[in-house]
Amino acid sequence: KLFRRRNRSLLLTEEGQSYFLDIKDIFSSLAEATDKLLERSEKGALTISLPPSFAIQWLVPRLADFNQQEPDIDVRIKAVDMDEGSLTDDVDVAIYYGRGSWPGLRADKLYQEFLIPLCSPALLLGNKPMEKLSDLAYHTLLHDTSRKDWKQFAKENGLDNVNVNHGPIFSHSTMVLQAAAHGQGVALGNNVLAQPEIDAGRLIAPFDEVLMTNNAFYVVCHEKQADMGRIATFRDWMLKKARSEQVDILQHKHNQ
């Protein structure tokens, strides 16, 4: 017998104690092997959930840099329309758009959002004027999801002559930017998502005025997993990338 019962507990017999000493090292080796296995799997696949627009305009063009730095981490991209709630059990990291407060999640700010009036170079050179903000009244306004952003922009800049209740509405930011790039009107473009189009010369900002919002892009994960190797590595890479690019943009504007 290995055990003897005393009241509601079990005690090792002499034979049980001897057996335990014999197998103790085996269990220690098993635990060590399990830890190594978990460590290897931790450095394996990394699933990221994020909005399609952010994936297309920001992450995918930069992913080669991460793959070069971390060749042992296989990134899996999961594009979803919804932000909150997309950090499911099969997802390690998510990109959320909002104000940064989600219970049980660690959220690190990537980019503060501001919106910029943007149009194609051809539209700027067209027959309709585009020299001052009030000239927006001569152009089609392109809307992202709703008309609230243009309404707020017009209110803050005293544009009583601009009709913000007309113009097509698109369900994705990338669609608005593409419409603007094809000369269909003027968009209020997100500073992060529009940057590739601006850099490529497909969109230009005819005015200096911007609309600051209370929203930002955040890289989020479950608090209990925040220090896991692959998650921390990817988060740190994103934050470093975002901060360095914001410095580059500020320096570029300063030199203009």
Regions found by a protein language model. Give the residues of each.
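Central regulatory/effector-binding core of bacterial HTH transcription factors
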Residues: 43-103, 251-256
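Hydrophobic hinge/microswitch elements
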Residues: 162-205, 212, 243
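Acidic, Gly/Pro-rich loop/turn segments at junctions of secondary structure
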Residues: 76-169
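Alpha-helical "hinge/linker" immediately C-terminal to small N-terminal DNA-binding modules
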Residues: 11-39
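Hydrophobic residues within well-ordered alpha-helices
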Residues: 13-16, 86, 136, 178-183, ...
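C-terminal effector-binding regulatory domain of bacterial HTH transcription factors
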Residues: 68, 72, 191-200, 210-256
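A short LG(V/I)-centered, amphipathic sequence patch enriched
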Residues: 1-12, 203
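Ligand-binding "clamshell"
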Residues: 102-109, 197-207
